[in-house]
Structures are given as C-alpha cells and as structure tokens.
C-alpha cells in the first residue's frame, strides 16, 4: 500500500461513512502499513482526511446544513502527538477552505488582512505586515497594482512570517 493509495482509501471510506446512516464510527485504518511512511504519518493523514470529510460550509447560509451521516470518528491510536499534529494541519486547511468559500463581497483584501492580523494575535510565533496601495507603489509593485485597478476594493499585500516554535530547554 503506497501513500497515494492510502489517502485514496481513507477518502473513499470516509465518503461512504458520511453518506451512510451511522453517526459515529471507529477506524483502524491508521494501523495499515504504508510503504515508505511511518505510523505517525498514517495517523496524521487519517485525522486530516477525517476532518476534510466532516467539513461543511455554512458560514453564509441562513440555516446551517443538517449533518448527514457521520458526525464523529474515533481513530484507533495511542499516538496523541500525531493526532494533535493532524488536527492542527486540518484546522489550517479548514480555515483556508472557509476563506475560499466566502463570497468576494465578504472576503475582500481588507477582510483577509484582518484575518491575518487576528492570526498574528492568536499565535505568538506569527508576524504580519500589511502593505497598502502607497507602500506597494513605493516598492514598484506595478503588476499587482494593475490587477487591483479592476476592483473597487483597495489592494492589500499580506506578508505572514512564521517564526517557528521555541526550542525546548536543554536539561
């Protein structure tokens, strides 16, 4: 079983669970050996795939979509570190999908800049700089400014810097 086939297997299993009658399920798929990958990778990918399968967009819907089928999945593992890592990655993917699914009259450059600033406040190891039209002109970003002329919204260039985690103290 190679990595691509494992991910495809996860997606197909989760798709079947989501469209079926079960509300909760347990999975041992993370225990399958995957060529060239360790068990931590399998657990992490399983968590990411499960979160993707459970995703429902309803940010701008009057009535949130009623969950159909699967709403909770237990993954058989003792590797809590890989589960947490998968959840963190899945959270980032979900946040990105939410932004991508928002209509353009809501998800404007200013809205994206506000989200970036919120991320910088939320995570101490993320820094943000937002350049406005004047700053972009000073830097000679004429191609970007040319594209922005087609919009009624003012351009914003967002620079997010991830500064990594702090090293663990040496004992």
Question: Where are the regions a protein language model picked out?
Answer:
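Short amphipathic alpha-helical segment within the helicase RecA-like ATPase core
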Residues: 1-171
